[in-house]
A protein has these predicted regions:
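Flexible "arm" and connector segments at domain edges
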Residues: 1-41, 45-86
Length: 86
């Protein structure tokens, strides 16, 4: 397995662990699962950063911000996340 493959494999595993942590929050509540969710999100963020650090993927800061902006625009249109009463 190459380094890039290993990074992507661990990234995939971390995504699954975030899914599991979110599921536990939904089932049992945030107060009992907050620290586990934070840990898994940080682990995922670490792997995302390694994807860029080792140039498994690359893009400019401007491209990152534009993609994030576009996602937020979609969420504003198709979800209720940004509504004041959510």
């Amino acid at each position: 397995m190459t380094r890039n493959e290993e990074i992507m494999t661990i990234l995939q595993e971390e995504c699954a662990e975030v899914i599991q942590a979110v599921s536990k929050v939904k089932r049992f509540g945030m107060s009992e699962n907050h620290s586990a969710l934070v840990k898994e999100l940080c682990d995922l963020q670490a792997m995302i950063e390694l994807m860029y650090e080792f140039q498994v993927v690359n893009c400019t800061i401007d491209q990152k911000f534009e993609n994030i902006f576009q996602k937020r625009q979609k969420l504003k249109k198709f979800s209720r996340i940004f509504e004041s009463n959510s």
